[in-house]
Amino acid sequence: MGETVTIQKNWQELIRPNKLQVTPGSDATRFATVVAEPLERGFGQTLGNALRRILLSSLQGAAVQSVHIDGVLHEFSSIAGVREDVTDIVLNIKDISIKMQGEGPKRMVVKKQGPGAVTAGDIQTVGDIVVLNPDLQLCTLDEGAEIRMEFTVATGKGYVPAERNRPEDAPIGLIPIDSLFSPVRKVSYKVENTREGQILDYDKLTMTIETNGAISPEDAVAYAARILQDQLNVFVNFEEPRKEVAQEIIPDLAFNPAFLKKVDELELSVRSANCLKNDNIVYIGDLVQKSEAEMLRTPNFGRKSLNEIKEVLAQMGLHLGMEVPGWPPENIDELAKRFEDHY
């Protein structure tokens, strides 16, 4: 048992943040600042660097893999009536941000006549594909010019170069495109000192995250943390020790185990706590047996203190004037120690 307790102290006695503080940016679907504090010294840098790398490289997203442009044989061509050459059009296509439900590959098409600009918003999509930056300009058409492009969209992670997006049986005219699947566009972090109580040398981790809108920054951090957790599991070579459960012992008690909690652990005012101490009321089991009249006879104990104690007991489902059979038990100190995690 002693060895188990020592092992558990390795992680149980480290300070941990209670929750993340998330501050949305101008567009909550794309920008946010996430703060975690307090962290043990050094953990800000450790977690910040690991989460940043995962956010940028390992989250699933959707992107264009290839494009077929009618009348174009390769990316070094030009199109009559289109001001941009095909190389520039391909560079613009790489910047299309997409959200797609389900697996790919899937198709989407744009067909337009000039004059005017062709934007990502002109793309005809199926129901489970959404173009997130419809104002992105793909090319410009002169009077009488026409263009038709068919895109192949797939899901993946990280960055995939065009060479890997070219299928072995690629038809003539299919132009593979570099794909940036990650829905996270930018991540930065900083680590500062923070205070916890009187201790000043804890870490505060602040992460600033920008996504393409396919995922919120808060969800992106959650997925990255889950990936890190899953990857680290293989390094844990032991089972989590099981604690004794109170249910196995409670049937042997003739009273509510909450009565074994000491009154000085209750959130009482100094005046009320001192009055209980002076009256030798140590455990809640001692307190609940007292009547209101008995409490008011306690020196320096007034109606305000009485109401405070009644409110605290009510929050625990208890009250003054209760009957507690079998109280106090002979081994009260030992029982209190065994049940301290269960009331």
From Swiss-Prot:
Q: Which UniProt keywords apply?
A: DNA-directed RNA polymerase, Nucleotidyltransferase, Transcription, Transferase
Give the CDD domains listed for this entry.
Answer: RNAP_alpha_NTD
Q: What is its EC number?
A: 2.7.7.6
Q: Which protein are we looking at?
A: DNA-directed RNA polymerase subunit alpha
Molecular function, one GO term: DNA binding
Q: Where is this region: Alpha N-terminal domain (alpha-NTD)?
A: 1-239
Return the annotated region ranges for Alpha C-terminal domain (alpha-CTD).
Answer: 255-343
Catalytic reaction(s) noted: RNA(n) + a ribonucleoside 5'-triphosphate = RNA(n+1) + diphosphate
Q: GO cellular component terms?
A: cytoplasm; DNA-directed RNA polymerase complex
Which HAMAP family does its entry note?
A: RNApol_bact_RpoA (MF_00059)
Domain of life of the organism in this record? Bacteria
Q: Which InterPro entries match?
A: DNA-dir_RNA_pol_insert, DNA-dir_RNA_pol_RpoA/D/Rpb3, DNA-dir_RpoA, RBP11-like, RNAP_asu_C, RNApol_insert_sf
Q: Where do the coiled-coil regions begin and end?
A: none
* Subunit and partners: Homodimer. The RNAP catalytic core consists of 2 alpha, 1 beta, 1 beta' and 1 omega subunit. When a sigma factor is associated with the core the holoenzyme is formed, which can initiate transcription.
Q: Give the protein family.
A: Belongs to the RNA polymerase alpha chain family.
Q: What is known of its domains?
A: The N-terminal domain is essential for RNAP assembly and basal transcription, whereas the C-terminal domain is involved in interaction with transcriptional regulators and with upstream promoter elements.
Q: Which GO biological process annotations does it have?
A: DNA-templated transcription
What's the stated role of this polypeptide? DNA-dependent RNA polymerase catalyzes the transcription of DNA into RNA using the four ribonucleoside triphosphates as substrates.
